[in-house]
């Protein structure tokens, strides 16, 4: 009998897992028809450099994330660099100071300070068209760097990946997933935690045909802009012409911008579960058109920000559920609120101007939402079929280099370049 070395056996199993990996489910909502890397052979990159190369190249790919890819320290650090103390930080080390980004006056007259941060987190990895990025089980983690989809890219699937630890101590520390001028993007079964800025953001250029589904936005943090252990910068939609389906997601321990939506956009938010939000969830600004149905809000202080709602919002209650039939081909589902504030918005103009490209959207009644979402949203749950724990079994804790001075320091020129490059592309 031939005995195989355990390491060789493990490597063989991982290789087989990568080859067998494929997308689970079918894109729906505005992202219907997205195919990503299609029939390209699934392959797992060997290291962070190869991952970056594969994401950015012009070839259709199915990129398998079968382990943790840790980018912290890969682009050096900025030590004792310019930062500021915003008015929101009234709690010292438990709050968030802000990185002073060149080309932006965000820090303005705030008191200056210095801080040390990781350069890799400032700018996401660029993702080219026709890509599928898919994690294996709960092992697929991208630490210290996000994903950036810009400049007309299209046909991309991101599924079953955990993005975490992008300079969570600092405002402007990095965005997990950013879109700016895209089409046909499906973000599914993703988890985001411990970021400095946005968990999911669309920039000023239109991102049409986007669905964010079955994902977990975990706002628990030691560095909170609201000084309460909840992350403020959560989901932001700024694209002119965005069309986004936001369904079956778990948004918890946030304190604002969950989401903030502006400009000429259409968002359909249904069957999401908001839990333990100490501030506001929806913040609907000028030009936005938002349909909110079949969601559950539990212990959410302010489901709709009343101070900034010049946009058009239709938040469905039991009395007007039938109004949706002409727009969606079915009645809407009323929202449910428990130990929460008021969810306002009754503008039926949202329905009369609803885009035709969303296709069929099947919504469940709110009594099923909390258990379904907590069992299915996030990583490691592609085959859960409605069962499982509320969060990933991957234990995410900040690595030592993120809160202490790292072993290597960037030269002044490389740090300045990183800050300038970030500021040119991030004004939201």
UniProtKB/Swiss-Prot annotation:
<feature type="compositionally biased region" description="Low complexity">
    <location>
        <begin position="389"/>
        <end position="417"/>
    </location>
</feature>
<keyword id="KW-0456">Lyase</keyword>
<dbReference type="InterPro" id="IPR045032">
    <property type="entry name" value="PEL"/>
</dbReference>
<keyword id="KW-0119">Carbohydrate metabolism</keyword>
<feature type="disulfide bond">
    <location>
        <begin position="324"/>
        <end position="332"/>
    </location>
</feature>
<dbReference type="GO" id="GO:0030570">
    <property type="term" value="F:pectate lyase activity"/>
</dbReference>
<feature type="region of interest" description="Disordered">
    <location>
        <begin position="383"/>
        <end position="428"/>
    </location>
</feature>
<comment type="similarity">
    <text>Belongs to the polysaccharide lyase 1 family.</text>
</comment>
<feature type="compositionally biased region" description="Basic residues">
    <location>
        <begin position="418"/>
        <end position="428"/>
    </location>
</feature>
<dbReference type="Pfam" id="PF00544">
    <property type="entry name" value="Pectate_lyase_4"/>
</dbReference>
<dbReference type="GO" id="GO:0005576">
    <property type="term" value="C:extracellular region"/>
</dbReference>
<feature type="signal peptide">
    <location>
        <begin position="1"/>
        <end position="20"/>
    </location>
</feature>
<keyword id="KW-0325">Glycoprotein</keyword>
<dbReference type="GO" id="GO:0047490">
    <property type="term" value="F:pectin lyase activity"/>
</dbReference>
<dbReference type="InterPro" id="IPR002022">
    <property type="entry name" value="Pec_lyase"/>
</dbReference>
<keyword id="KW-0624">Polysaccharide degradation</keyword>
<dbReference type="GO" id="GO:0045490">
    <property type="term" value="P:pectin catabolic process"/>
</dbReference>
<dbReference type="GO" id="GO:0071555">
    <property type="term" value="P:cell wall organization"/>
</dbReference>
<dbReference type="InterPro" id="IPR011050">
    <property type="entry name" value="Pectin_lyase_fold/virulence"/>
</dbReference>
<dbReference type="InterPro" id="IPR012334">
    <property type="entry name" value="Pectin_lyas_fold"/>
</dbReference>
<keyword id="KW-0964">Secreted</keyword>
<feature type="disulfide bond">
    <location>
        <begin position="83"/>
        <end position="107"/>
    </location>
</feature>
<feature type="active site">
    <location>
        <position position="257"/>
    </location>
</feature>
<protein>
    <recommendedName>
        <fullName>Probable pectin lyase F</fullName>
        <ecNumber>4.2.2.10</ecNumber>
    </recommendedName>
</protein>
<keyword id="KW-0961">Cell wall biogenesis/degradation</keyword>
<keyword id="KW-1015">Disulfide bond</keyword>
<feature type="glycosylation site" description="N-linked (GlcNAc...) asparagine">
    <location>
        <position position="276"/>
    </location>
</feature>
<comment type="function">
    <text>Pectinolytic enzymes consist of four classes of enzymes: pectin lyase, polygalacturonase, pectin methylesterase and rhamnogalacturonase. Among pectinolytic enzymes, pectin lyase is the most important in depolymerization of pectin, since it cleaves internal glycosidic bonds of highly methylated pectins.</text>
</comment>
<keyword id="KW-0732">Signal</keyword>
